[in-house]
Every structure is written in C-alpha cells, then in structure tokens.
Amino acid sequence: MKVQLQHRAIRVRLDRAEFDSLLRGLTLRLALRHSDDALFAVEICAGPRLELTGGAEGWRLQLPTGELEAYAPTLPRRDGLHFDIGDGLGIDLEVDLRGKSTTG
C-alpha cells in the first residue's frame, strides 16, 4: 500500500492482493516509525459509508463497500475511484494490477 498526500487530496494505491483483502473485510495498515514513535499511521477498511477520522494514533479511512464491490469486476482499468470527503478534500483510490495478485 502506498499513501500519497497532496494539496487537498489523499492518493491511495493498492496492489490487487491488498484490494482483495479490503473486499474480504480486512483492515490494511501502514505505519512509519522512528525509534518508538509513530510518525505517521493510517488504517484503511471497507464499510457502509465513506469516513475519514484522525487522532493521536493516526488516521482511519473507511471506503464504501458497495463502490469497491462495483469497481472490482471492472478491473483492470486505468482510472481509479474518486471520493469527495467534503470541504474540497478528495480521496483517490487506484489498484495497481502490475504488482502482486491473488486468484480465486
């Protein structure tokens, strides 16, 4: 998983195995640590609606399951999903099919 912060946007890039894990209800985690301190942490999961929350422990991004499920059978494709979180902030989700993949 790669998370890129841009002006008014968060870009999330997953490989196919990570995307499949989201569809199965698993939570993806990414943390950057220095010594014992968490400098950056994010959790991404699927749920009933789009939510972005943050706190001392990091961010949690919940992506709408229905939109993920509708997107899955259209892969591979060049464009990703875009979500408007409000206040001009966008979430872009892309699935990199050149990386690892799972079958089944």
Kindly give the residue locations of the regions a language model identified.
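Residue-level detector of beta-strand structural context in well-folded domains
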Residues: 1-3, 50
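Short, structured motif recognition centered on aromatic/hydrophobic residues
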Residues: 3-5, 10-14, 59-63
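One face of beta-strands
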Residues: 10, 30, 48-50, 55-59, ...
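Extended intrinsically disordered, low-complexity coil regions enriched in Ser, Thr, Gly, Ala
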Residues: 16-37, 69-81
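Beta-strand elements of well-folded, non-transmembrane domains
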Residues: 18, 46, 65-67, 95-99
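N-terminal intrinsically disordered, cationic/polar leader segments
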Residues: 24-26, 38-50, 55
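Mid-chain, well-packed structural core segment of small domains
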Residues: 48-80
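C-terminal charged interaction modules
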Residues: 77-104
